[in-house]
């Protein structure tokens, strides 16, 4: 994993409900923890675009519900600042479920994916239909 080029303001915290942007059968995910987060005592972990998070499936098919999985945040409502000065924000907060090798578990990704995610996770970029 490489560093992000954009200044990502983290718009999701622990407990946030986000939509699942792939076709694994999950529809809504709840953020449980953020991988690699080291913060102040008693502070909720924050996540932004391109971060790996541990999620619990709250809505979806009966086989997927209540599972604890790894996911990557691909969209967030909070604007992020790119090096050229532009700011990018999306309509919703969304994530893609991944496996142990950082490959997406689904075969298609619905909606746009941020360019920062595509640079960090090549397998998600190849599966995505639109990169913004």
Swiss-Prot record:
Q: Which residues form a coiled coil?
A: none
Its Gene Ontology biological processes? translation
One matching Pfam family is Ribosomal_L14
Any one annotated GO CC term: cytosolic large ribosomal subunit
Signal peptide range equals none
Q: Which GO terms describe its molecular function?
A: large ribosomal subunit rRNA binding; structural constituent of ribosome
Question: What keywords appear on the UniProt entry?
Answer: Ribonucleoprotein, Ribosomal protein, RNA-binding, rRNA-binding
Residues annotated as transmembrane? none
As for family, the record states: Belongs to the universal ribosomal protein uL14 family.
Q: How does it assemble?
A: Part of the 50S ribosomal subunit. Forms a cluster with proteins L3 and L24e, part of which may contact the 16S rRNA in 2 intersubunit bridges.
Function, as annotated, reads: Binds to 23S rRNA. Forms part of two intersubunit bridges in the 70S ribosome.
Q: Which HAMAP family match?
A: Ribosomal_uL14 (MF_01367)
Protein name according to UniProt: Large ribosomal subunit protein uL14
Upper lineage is: Archaea, Methanobacteriati, Methanobacteriota, Stenosarchaea group, Halobacteria
- Which gene underlies this protein? rpl14
